[in-house]
């Protein structure tokens, strides 16, 4: 019969059962046709892929970090003890003059200063002016790390009370300094101390408020107060920093 091909079931099993090599080759051809030629698509995809983003909290090199020294701690402790703002301490002031000759107050301040800096007694500290005392404490307490035993408790207790209504803890200060402003770790004790000093009740013995009288009842209030403290710390250091734009991924800038 013409048109009918007679096959041997053993010899031509591949054709009979549709497992012949022609089908396999056709499938491979389809795979090759669908695959990217010369790796073009893979290269394009690699070129289009976004580069890894830098961590938002990484401090930026163009903004200098700060160092909270023994001299800084001395100034903060004296200003806190004498109920003044740090900027109101004059170069000629001394612990003796600031305590108005009250030996009990003077002696307690000297004890606290020695404890904060882990120095014990500091010879001549009572009579030394602020410039001399700063130089002396910096030289004697080179290994100081903020905060010491006195300021850590004083500042922490005060901030816990002040920030309590907002639901924020003192650690929020460091988080905002590092993660939002992208400043170095050295800024944290400066901003923390500044915020604590500025939120004390009452007024300075040398006149004027300690800081803004705005309420810190909400989280946004606390954030704004921290931002203000950062700007004021920067100004005291002769710097001007700007909060980075949320979408830019860049760090705080300095003028």
Locate the predicted segments by residue.
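4′-phosphopantetheine-dependent carrier domains
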Residues: 1-255
């Amino acid at each position: 019969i013409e048109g009918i091909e007679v096959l041997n079931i053993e010899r031509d099993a591949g054709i009979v059962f549709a497992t012949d090599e022609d089908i396999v080759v056709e499938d491979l051809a389809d795979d090759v046709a669908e695959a990217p030629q010369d790796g073009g698509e893979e290269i394009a995809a690699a070129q289009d892929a976004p580069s890894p983003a830098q961590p938002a909290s990484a401090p930026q090199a163009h903004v200098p970090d700060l160092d909270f020294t023994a001299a800084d701690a001395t100034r903060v402790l004296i200003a806190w003890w004498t109920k003044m703002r740090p900027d109101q301490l004059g170069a000629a002031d001394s612990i003796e003059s600031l305590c108005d000759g009250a030996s009990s107050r003077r002696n307690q301040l000297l004890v606290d200063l020695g404890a904060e800096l882990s120095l014990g007694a500091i010879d001549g500290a009572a009579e030394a002016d602020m410039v001399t005392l700063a130089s002396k404490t910096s030289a004697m307490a080179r290994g100081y790390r903020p905060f010491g035993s006195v300021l850590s408790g004083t500042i922490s207790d005060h901030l816990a009370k002040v920030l309590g209504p907002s639901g924020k803890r003192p650690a929020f200060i460091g988080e905002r300094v590092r993660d939002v402003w992208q400043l170095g770790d050295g800024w944290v004790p400066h901003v923390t101390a500044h915020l604590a000093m500025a939120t004390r009740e009452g007024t300075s013995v040398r006149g004027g408020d300690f800081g803004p009288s705005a309420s810190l009842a909400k989280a946004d209030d606390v954030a704004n107060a921290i931002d203000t403290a950062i700007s004021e710390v920067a100004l005291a250091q002769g710097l001007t920093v700007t909060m980075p734009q949320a979408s830019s991924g860049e760090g705080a800038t300095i003028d």
